[in-house]
Amino acid sequence: TVILFNGGGNFGDLYRECQDFRLRVIEQFPNNRIIMFPQSIWYEDESLIAKDAAVMARHNDLTLCARDKWSYNFLKEHFGKNKILLVPDMAFYISDEYLNKYRECVFWGQKLYLRRIDKEMDFSTILDDLRGFDIRDWPSLERRPICLLILRIMKRAAYYLQKITCLTVLQRFVNRLADEYAIRIVRPYLLKRGCDFISPYSEVITTRLHGLILSILFHKPVYYINNTTGKLSAYVDTWHLQDILEVSPYVDKILEKHVD
């Protein structure tokens, strides 16, 4: 069985619970092939780097994918005993056939300032009172979808069932059911919700990398504001997206155009 870890921006200690989960799986399945989809890397506590690297180095077949050059070089330096790849974010693997359904659904004049509200937001870069912009965060983070709650309940049930020896068959069934639910219900729902969110806008300013990526895929004018770890600029620089402008150097131009 090949084990796949989701990509994103949670490798390191910014979201430590995600990293701890990865480490537990890596330790529990030392002989299974494991592939981590493209990640951005960030450590506040540098003492954790060697500890994490030691756990991963003991695995027999672990591939770590980075989605920007800074993260790739970091992994090559500190996690060099594993196979390291530089790969675009998984959102770029959404099919053109799927994206084409949304590319024409634009309401001209509607503009989005996608402003994250979590610990990755650099509050020194906040733009207030943008004229004509909707100020939103990612919809599934503003309001947790019911399907994610159901999936969490199913996974929690499977976790507790595994502790009861006589119910291991039921535990496997619930776990398989949860996996099918995630693949057939949750994933399509979250993808559709993200596309429904971004596609109507004719212009986007974003503090989230996936807001940037979806805007690119939908061929929209987009500016970005870096998060606290610099992952947006790292991604833009890595994949030579020089026509995508960072707000900070152009803030006067943006404000002159859009702020009351």
Specify the residue positions occupied by each region the protein language model found:
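Active-site anion-handling motifs in enzyme catalytic cores
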Residues: 1-260
